[in-house]
């Protein structure tokens, strides 16, 4: 079996979650899940909506570029809403990765591909 390269994304969405403990929680569950699946984490991305970075420095832009270049096969987050700032952004981002051959997985719900395809179809 070919080993799957995996990128891990950790994101805090509110000031309550901004603390280091929340990021470490996400990191811990993602690393454990990746290990259980036999995936090789190659990159970790940390993002806080309150960190003051311009939107064009969002880790999703770098992740998208990596997907376009087929640098990894799995994007893993702790929960689906960590992919974007609002639900429609989460679905659009996940659909982008799926179109570029990257499977989107969450620790809480597993493989999100089928759900993403359903949501994209209903948005048309």
Predicted feature locations:
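Short, structured surface patches at the beginning of a domain
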Residues: 1-124
């Amino acid at each position: 079996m070919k080993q799957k390269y995996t990128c891990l994304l950790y994101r805090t969405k509110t000031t309550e979650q901004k603390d280091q403990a929340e990021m470490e929680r996400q990191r811990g569950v993602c690393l454990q899940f990746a290990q259980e699946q036999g995936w090789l984490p190659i990159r970790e991305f940390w993002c806080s909506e309150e960190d003051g970075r311009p939107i064009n420095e969002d880790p999703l832009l770098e992740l998208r570029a990596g997907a376009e270049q087929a640098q990894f096969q799995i994007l893993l987050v702790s929960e689906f809403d960590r992919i974007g700032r609002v639900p429609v952004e989460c679905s659009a981002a996940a659909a982008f990765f799926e179109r570029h051959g990257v499977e989107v997985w969450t620790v809480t719900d597993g493989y999100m591909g089928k759900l993403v395809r359903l949501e994209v179809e209903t948005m048309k």
